[in-house]
Amino acid sequence: MRRNEASPGVHTSSIVYRLASPGPWSHIRRAWAVTSKDAAQELRRRVALAAVFFFAATALALVSYAIGPFGLRPEDRAPVQAALLWIILFFSAATGLPRAFVREEETGTALALRKVTSGVLVLAGKTLFNYTLFLAIAAVAIPGFAILLEWNVSAPVQLVVIVVLAGWGLTAVSTFLSALVAQAGQKNVLFVVISFPMLLPLLLFAISGTLAATRSEGTTTAIQVILAYDGAATCAAYLLAEVAWEE
């Protein structure tokens, strides 16, 4: 039993060294090693993942009573539903995404990662894991939202595109900000205070695109803006990753 409970630092170093051997694909292997490490840690604990999904389920239940079949009239629900969906997705993600780098500081594995790989690759690996987590949250929350609130989407394919693209921007920014607040005192509060203004433009166009998909209207403008935001956020995170991770 004691043999299996290796320290987090040893576990982190062994994974990165094993998968980061020199070669043409070494960068991809290093980023994937970080993703695998985070996934293994979360699956082993399950507490953080359970908290994220429990928050999403609780929010869905409360919202369904407020504006569901016994609340607002059907013709008045669409704008409120689009906004509430992204509020639920944002705060559900904010429950788990900030722990990307905070976890390394708390478990003492940050120093090991700094020694064996670059900040860009650490950020890439953690962003990939967080993006997978966001998609899992969306895959659970959106069907539940549609059932509990009797939400009808006229263009489901467009909705999926909006969620996938906006989810990447939300994840990229959140993961980068997690590196900035990892060593702060009030990490969770600081993360929400910093992230909301930066994510507000993305969330506004995500809500706009979701509403358009609900009404089978054009989503081209929303998708273009979200793509531009994703590109800018990804480039900024790439350029500043080393500074955020090392400092």
Where are these regions (language model features)?
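Aromatic- and glycine-rich beta-strand/loop motifs that create alpha-glucan
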Residues: 15-52
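Junction motif at the cytosolic side of a transmembrane helix
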Residues: 17, 231-247
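Transmembrane helix boundary and interhelical loop/hinge segments in multi-pass membrane proteins
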Residues: 42, 94-112, 127
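Hydrophobic alpha-helical transmembrane segments of multi-pass membrane transport/permease proteins
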Residues: 46-69, 84-91, 194-205, 229-236
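Membrane-interfacial helix-loop-helix connectors in multipass membrane proteins
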Residues: 66-80, 143-164, 210-223
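Long, hydrophobic alpha-helical segments
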Residues: 81-101
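Selective transmembrane-helix segments that form parts of the transport pathway or gating/packing helices
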Residues: 118-145
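A structural motif at transmembrane helix-loop-helix junctions in multipass membrane proteins
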Residues: 162-196, 245-247
